[in-house]
Each structure stands twice: as structure tokens, then as C-alpha cells.
Amino acid sequence: GGFQLTGMAAIDMACWDILGKKTGLPVYTLLGGKQQDKVKLYKVVTRTDPDAMAARIPEYRAQGYRNFQVKVGENPLTDISRIRKIAACMEPGEVLNADANTGWKQHQALIVADAIKDLPRERGLLLYFEQPCLTYEECLTVRRHTDLPFVLDECMDSLAALLRAHHDNAMDLINLKINRMGGLTRARQIRDLCVSLGLPMNVEDSWGGEIATAAIAHLAHSTPTEFQFQSSAFHEYSTVCIADGAPSVKNGYMSVADTAGLGVTPILESLTSVSEFS
């Protein structure tokens, strides 16, 4: 299951870090060598009032971002307003990724896709439609009814799932999430297959802090630029710092130092309970 794989991922990351420190090599070297000096990032626009979401775009652009992931997946009409208002604030050539995180039913996703289909031509932007529905079958149906570039995320949880989706021409990109694959070992295998298939990726994780971001950065650095579409620096969204030496973020890009292993040192004092759920 998902929690088991996430637990495996933490152990797997630690093993790669140990191997890097033992050999004196950065993890990106062990994963295939540095293919790019800096990794393109996107900025998440969290779901709230449409006008408030749109107001964030100039702020994030001033920080150097040109790729924006817009969280949708609620009421279709409200989501259409969110996407349209954000698109109106964007400049030609910028990337808008409408991410529903499985939140729509199939009929709702079809309504939204049809309502926003002309935005790329009207605004000169690059508009992507990400994981609109929960099941692979629903997503595939939506995919076959829209010309928008399509991203699969939650469905991409194994090598078999990737091969099936590629056979069905179900997507144009995938979100490659390290924790969902059980760590860097399996994620590298999926990454290499995507490169062989000519399939670009968002090199990612589901969430995390400095350590998860370092793993993302090393995998992304070792991925050819044309196949690493965008990534996220999760420690930028966190209020608790759990490690020193996190990747540096500047002008919408992330980079890691040429130090051995993942390049981060856990702050053991931070390993206390931050929050509790019941």
C-alpha cells in the first residue's frame, strides 16, 4: 500500500545517501550523472477564492517562477472561474497546470476541459490537465475527449501502470513521485523507462521537507533536461526545518551542492511530534 511504500522510500533514500557518502559521490552521480545544472520548479497555487488565487501569480512571477500548478477539483463552475482568472494574469509562454488531484467525477472533468480548451490560443499559455478523476478508466475517457496535454499522477504507482498507460496513449507526461514508487531505486527505473519511451516527467514526491526535496533534486539533476518538465521544492512550503544543506532555490530553479550523498544533514532535534492525528 501507499504508506508501506512511503516507509520503504525513506529507507531507500537513506541507503543511497550512505552509498554516496561511502564513495564520496553525490547521489545524482550514482543515479546516472548530472544532466542539468539547475532544475526547473513550479509554484503551487493553493485552492481558495478565485480572485485570491489569481492575485498570487504576479507575486510568484516576481520570485522567478513561470510554471504554476493550480489546485482545483471542487465545484466545476468555481474551478472554471479559478482557471480562467489565473490564466488572465499569466504571460505568453507560461505554464498553467490544472491539477484536480482526482477530485472530479468524469462528467465534471469533461465540463471543465471543454470550458477551458480555448485558453492556450486566447492567452498564449501552455495549459495542462492533471489527474482529473480517481480511476485510470475515468481519466482515460477524459483524455480521449480533450486535446489538452494530459498528466497522470495518482494512477502512476508502478512500472506496470506506466506500461499500460503508455500502451493506451493515456498521457503526455507523468508525475514521478519517489515515495509512491518506494524510493529512488524504483523511481530511477521508472525514470529511465520514461526516457526510453520519450515521455517527459514531473520529478516529484507527494510531500516532504529538506530530505525529500534533496532526493527530488538529485533524481531531477540526473534526468535529461528535455524529459524533466518541472519539479517542486517542498521545503519552501514547510514551517519546520528537518535538515541542513537543503537544495538552493533561486529564480524558479533548484540546485544541489556537489557534496557526497544527498548533501543534507538531519536535525535530530526536529524529530519530535509536529502534529498528531486521530
Give residue spans per PLM region.
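Acidic, glycine-rich loop-and-beta core segments that form the ion-binding/anion-interacting portion
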Residues: E94-F150
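N-terminal capping/lid subdomain adjacent to the active-site entrance of alpha/beta enzymes
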Residues: G1-N97, N101-L110, D114-K117, C241-S278
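Non-catalytic positions within long, well-ordered alpha-helices that form the structural scaffold/packing
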Residues: P58-R61, K117, R121-E122, H166-H167, ...
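Active-site catalytic pocket residues across diverse enzymes, especially alpha/beta-hydrolases
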Residues: M90, P120, T223
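A cross-family glycoside hydrolase active-site/sugar-binding cleft signature
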Residues: Y42-V44, Q69-G73, N97-N101, E130-P132, ...
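Active-site-adjacent beta->alpha loops and helix N-cap segments on the catalytic face
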Residues: P50-A52, E74-M90, W104-A109, P132-R143, ...
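Shared catalytic-loop signature of beta/alpha-barrel
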Residues: L125-L126, L134-V151, M156-Y253, A257
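Active-site groove signature of glycoside hydrolases
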Residues: R66-N75, R121-L127, I174-N175
